[in-house]
Amino acid sequence: MNIEATIIVMVYKNLNQVIQTLDSIKKQTYSNYEVIVSDDGSPNYTQEDFDKITEQYKNEFTYFKLINNGINRGTVKHFNSLIRQAKGTIICPLSSGDQFYNENSLQEIMNAFDQEDKLIYTSKRMIKKENSIEYYPSLYQVSLLDQSNHFFEYIMKYGNFVSGASTYYKKEIFDKYGLFDEK
């Protein structure tokens, strides 16, 4: 069976929060994915800590791997190494402590890639106190993505509206354009 999605969970000094992330992944209705959890050399955990998590979750997922880098390589090198290991056609990065919004989140991500031929998707929602939901980026911000000079001007003035925590990639984007710049 071909794996369609790879959920990458990056950890640094917050392994204690990975349980809520893994529990959120476990609740997903979509099932054709692998989970790669990788610690980037946190100095405050032992191999025994990693072994406990592996033991707890190895049977919860069809494909599960926990990696302990041993040394800190930095976020970008760490992420690039995990992209290289990913078997899925869609990359869904999470950080330790992140949770999917609901049990259909991964299915919705996969549907978005199925419905349109895009290499990258990003979206975020702000849930306000009165339980209303505001979607980001706005339609105006989306239009800026097709106008690179206006996009860069906008993010320099108003901040970057593209959130790494809610950006998903077809793996082929990295084959076509390369990995993230490690400099």
Residue ranges and their predicted role:
Residues 1-24:
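N-proximal low-complexity "stem/linker" segments adjacent to membrane-targeting elements
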Residues 22-23, 47-51, 80, 88, ...:
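Short alpha-helix within the catalytic core of nucleotide-sugar-dependent glycosyltransferases
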Residues 91:
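Short aromatic/hydrophobic "clamp" motif used to bind/position activated sugar donors
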Residues 99, 104-135:
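Conserved donor NDP-sugar-binding/catalytic core segment of glycosyltransferases
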Residues 40, 94-96:
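Active-site acidic Asp-centered loop
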Residues 122, 143-183:
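Conserved nucleotide-sugar donor-binding catalytic segment
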Residues 22-67:
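Acidic donor-binding segment of Leloir-type glycosyltransferases
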Residues 68-86:
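Glycine-rich, basic loop-to-helix element that forms the pyrophosphate-binding segment
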